Structure formats: structure tokens, C-alpha cells
Design a protein with these regions (language model features):
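Intrinsically disordered, low-complexity acidic/Ser/Thr-rich segments used as protein-protein interaction/activation
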Residues: 78-128, 132-295, 337-353, 381-390, ...
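Charge-rich, intrinsically disordered regulatory segments
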Residues: 1-114, 121-124, 128, 466-483
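Flexible, glycine- and charge-enriched loops at secondary-structure boundaries
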Residues: 3, 153-160, 203-206, 311-318, ...
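Structural helix-adjacent loops and short alpha-helical linkers that scaffold large soluble proteins
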Residues: 202, 374-382, 419-428
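C-terminal transactivation domains of fungal Zn(2)-Cys(6)
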Residues: 147-150, 273-379
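C-terminal region signature
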Residues: 404-409, 421-484
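Hydrophobic, well-ordered secondary-structure elements that form the walls
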Residues: 30, 366, 412
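Residue position in alpha-helical solenoids
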Residues: 170, 216-219, 328, 369, ...
């Protein structure tokens, strides 16, 4: 027996504490002994000091994640080792702590949503190497976006590169093994978010992960068991499925087709049968607005794509959709909708949820006026909606995770695209900056940069009334804009 133990060797050599030659798919020792050879994800690090690799920090403002005791019941502490006995290096433990207390908080509109995500995902990832590596990569991307260059003395860029290489390999392996459970769906979605948080421009790899989720759901048979019976994971997956829907549906994703069996099947798999048939007018505790409104946004996107060459059909559908959204606004003004959430809301949270929902209604009106009625920014209906949104934003709790502010990317960007005077632009830039600090993701910085470029082009073209639609300019500028 050798005293030199391989840190990247197979399970059998590690169990026998001997040096492994790390040949794949079968190492030399296992091949000679005719034993089964298996490699698992190993959280290993070299002792070398990795040089900082030119991180982008010009836009970053370092903000620490909220203390865990600020979100009610704190997420479960991260263990020192994985269930299989592998010691968790301090660097990875730091990343998991930030994933739990920082990243998941920045995706949560309320502390109870944060608790749902932590209770469902954290225990599950400790047993799932592909989900664990995706979560670590998302955490690393989040820290990079906040201007950090190292974690426990190691370059975060190097961490992210290592996780992308090993983690995506694990994901491909799991896919070849025909795994189609909720952990696979969560893994693909978290890899999508990791690419979004990293703010990668060029090839939009996050779209590939969204398409992967769609393929998983479309290929799922209704009688198959997607869930594992873990109620905590099921609660987390309900939220993550709505995140998937919103990523597909919100504007400026014109190349992704949101309709199809994946949405209906996902609704059946992650929700009870009654909610799968009808969308509730209640405000969803994860989204910050109603699924009913999300459906309407999907219809607007679909009408824009399918009827662009048939103006009469487009106008008729626009009138129907306008009647629906105005009906929702009138109904909710008379009787404010309830919030679908597992905990009792404070008066402040109740107000913020209602304001967020109403802001999304007005932003949907703007999308309708702009995309289907082709109105310019200076038109009275659009400016009326802009002023309504700005007034409601002033009354919201701003810039905090575990609050509805985390959902504000779409309305802020929508209002920003219609801003055509200095005061409006300054107002929106201030709010987008607060969103960037709150979420800690480079995709928000991309949103800010895109708005400035849209405004510059309109000025260059002397388009002072906002006649040129921002979606045309974004396509020309080749931005990968994602809103959630």
C-alpha cells in the first residue's frame, strides 16, 4: 500500500487508500482486478496561488449578503463534510453559505420563499453532485458580480472555470443516464442562472439550459414520477417552475417559444390539479404578481410573433388583450387580490406585494401599447402608465433581498425603454442601481448598459418622441437581455 493517496482517483482506489492512475473509464488497478470503477465529483484544490484573471470591477459595488438571522428562521448551517464523507473545503463551504444566505435570498420576494428554497435545495444538493456543482458555480458567479476576486485565497475565476468544466460534464453524464427527475430540472435552471449572473454576452448559453428544461418536461410521460416525495423539494420546485416560466415569458426573449406541452405538464407536475387548469388571480408569493398576468404577457409575445404580417388580426387580438388587462386592473382596484404564500404577511409586505403586482400590470399595458399598437414613448397611454409605475415605485421598499424589489427587472427596464427626458432617465438609473446592489448579478448591469445605449441611439437619430421601439434597437445592438 502506498502512502500517496490520489485526490482525483476512483472510488475503489480511494477506499483502499492507494494511488490511482486516474485512467478513464477504468483505472489500471480496477482493470487488473476486474472491479467496477467509478469516479465521483471531488471537491479538491491545488495549493498553488492562482493569479487574478482580469475581473471586471468598474461597475461593481461590493455589498455583503444579508445576515441569515434577518430572514426569520435562518437556513440550515452548511456541514463540514458531504454525506459520502468527503470533507468540504473551506472555499466551497463559503460558496455554499453565500448560495444559501445570498443568492437564494436575492431570488426571494419574501423570507418564507427564501426558507422554502433553502430547505428544498440545500439538503438535496449534498447528495447530488450535478446539482451541487451548478449551485457552487452560481454562487461563484454571484461573488464575481459583486466585485470579489478571491474566496479563501483562491481565484474565483479559477473556481468558476473548474466548476463549469467538471459540473457540466456531470450534467451531461446524468442526461445520458436518462435521469428526468426534479433534481435534473433544478440543475438545468441553476446552470441557466449561473450564466445569467455571470453576465456573459455573445453566445447566450442560458438559453440552451432553458431549452434543456423544456426538453426534459416535454419528454416526460404523464404517468412517470418526476418528484421524489420530498415535500421540501416539491415546495422549492413550485417556485423554480414559476421562475422557469417567467424566464421564458418576460419580454426581450423573442427567440424562445414559451408555449407547448412543457408549461402545461410542468403546471401539472409541480402544482395541484385545480391550479393546473385555471390560473389564479391571486398574487403569487414567488413571482410578486399573478400567474394570470404572466399568461397575458405570454399571449402578447405570441401575438407579436405570429401576427406580425397580418395587421388586422393583430389589431383584433390587441383589443381583446387590452380588454383583459383593463378588466384585471379594474377588478383588483375594487378588491385587492390575496397573496398566495405560506406565511402571514406584515402590513409592509402586503403593501409591497400589491404594489409590485400593480406595477407589473402597468408594465404589461406598456408592452401591449408598444408591441401591438406601435405607440411611441411620448404617447399619452404609455406616459400615463409610466407615471403610474413611477409613483408606485416611490412607495415600495427598495433595494433589499427577500422582498418584492427582487422582481422589478422587467418593469424597470420597460419604463427605462420609454424614458425620453433627463429626469425619467435619472430616476430609472437610480432604481436599476438599487436592483443591481440587491440581486448581485451582472445581468442587471447589462440592463443598465443597454438602456444607456438605447437612449444614445435615439438621441443620435433625433428620435425625441421615442418612435423607435427599444426591441429593434436591442436586436441591432446584439444584447442578450434577460428579465426576472
Amino acid at each position: 500500500m502506498t502512502n500517496h493517496r490520489s485526490r482525483r482517483g476512483c472510488e475503489e482506489c480511494r477506499r483502499r487508500r492507494r494511488k490511482c492512475d486516474e485512467l478513464k473509464p477504468t483505472c489500471g488497478h480496477c482493470n487488473a482486478a476486474n472491479r467496477s470503477c467509478r469516479y465521483e465529483l471531488r471537491l479538491v484544490w491545488s495549493d498553488r496561488k492562482v493569479q487574478h484573471r482580469g475581473l471586471r470591477t468598474t461597475h461593481c459595488r461590493l455589498v455583503q449578503p444579508p445576515p441569515l438571522d434577518s430572514v426569520g428562521q435562518s437556513p440550515a448551517p452548511i456541514p463540514d463534510s458531504l454525506p459520502n464523507g468527503v470533507i468540504l473545503p473551506r472555499r466551497y463551504k463559503k460558496l455554499l453559505e453565500y448560495f444559501s444566505g445570498g443568492v437564494l435570498a436575492s431570488l426571494s420576494s419574501h423570507p418564507s420563499i427564501h426558507q422554502d428554497l433553502c430547505r428544498g435545495l440545500i439538503p438535496k444538493m449534498l447528495y447530488s453532485p450535478h446539482l451541487l456543482s451548478a449551485s457552487l458555480a452560481l454562487s461563484a458567479a454571484g461573488l464575481l458580480s459583486r466585485g470579489l476576486s478571491e474566496v479563501e485565497g483562491t481565484s474565483i475565476s479559477y473556481v468558476l472555470e473548474h466548476l463549469q468544466s467538471s459540473g457540466l460534464s456531470l450534467l451531461r453524464k446524468a442526461l445520458t443516464e436518462q435521469r428526468k427527475d426534479e433534481v435534473m430540472v433544478a440543475t438545468c435552471l441553476i446552470w441557466c442562472l449561473a450564466d445569467v449572473f455571470a453576465g456573459i454576452q455573445g453566445v447566450p448559453s442560458w438559453r440552451i439550459h432553458l431549452q434543456g428544461i423544456k426538453a426534459l418536461l416535454d419528454g416526460h410521460q404523464p404517468d412517470d414520477q418526476l418528484g421524489t416525495g420530498d415535500t421540501a423539494m416539491e415546495s422549492a420546485m413550485r417556485h423554480l417552475f414559476l421562475l422557469y416560466r417567467s424566464l421564458q415569458t418576460l419580454p426581450y426573449l423573442q427567440t424562445i417559444e414559451p408555449s407547448g406541452p412543457s408549461v402545461d405538464l410542468g403546471q401539472t407536475l409541480f402544482f395541484d390539479s385545480s391550479s393546473a387548469l385555471t390560473r389564479s388571480p391571486k398574487i403569487d408569493g414567488f413571482l410578486g404578481y399573478s400567474e394570470e398576468l404572466l399568461d397575458l404577457l405570454q399571449h402578447i409575445n405570441s401575438a407579436t410573433r405570429n401576427n406580425s404580417d397580418h395587421q388586422f388580426s393583430l389589431n383584433a387580438e390587441a383589443d381583446i388583450l387590452l380588454g383583459k388587462i383593463n378588466g384585471m386592473i379594474s377588478r383588483d382596484a375594487k378588491t385587492p387580490p390575496e397573496v398566495s404564500i405560506s406565511s402571514t404577511l406584515s402590513p409592509q409586505y402586503s403593501r409591497d406585494f400589491l404594489l409590485c403586482h400593480q406595477i407589473f400590470q402597468q408594465a404589461t399595458l406598456i408592452q401591449l401599447y408598444r408591441q401591438l399598437y406601435m405607440m411611441p414613448s411620448a404617447s399619452r397611454p404609455i406616459q400615463s402608465a409610466v407615471q403610474a409605475i413611477n409613483g408606485m415605485i416611490q412607495n415600495m421598499t427598495q433595494g433589499q433581498p427577500c422582498n418584492t424589489w427582487v422582481a422589478m427587472a422587467m418593469p424597470l427596464f420597460t419604463v427605462g425603454c420609454e424614458a425620453f427626458d433627463g429626469d425619467q432617465k435619472d430616476f430609472i438609473l437610480d432604481k436599476v442601481q438599487k436592483l443591481e446592489v440587491c440581486i448581485g448579478s451582472l445581468h442587471v448591469h447589462t440592463i443598465k448598459r443597454a438602456l444607456k445605449d438605447v437612449w444614445k441611439i435615439r438621441t443620435d437619430y433625433q428620435d425625441f418622441e421615442g418612435n423607435i421601439c427599444a426591441s429593434q434597437l436591442l436586436e441591432k445592438l446584439q444584447y442578450n437581455i434577460i428579465l426576472f
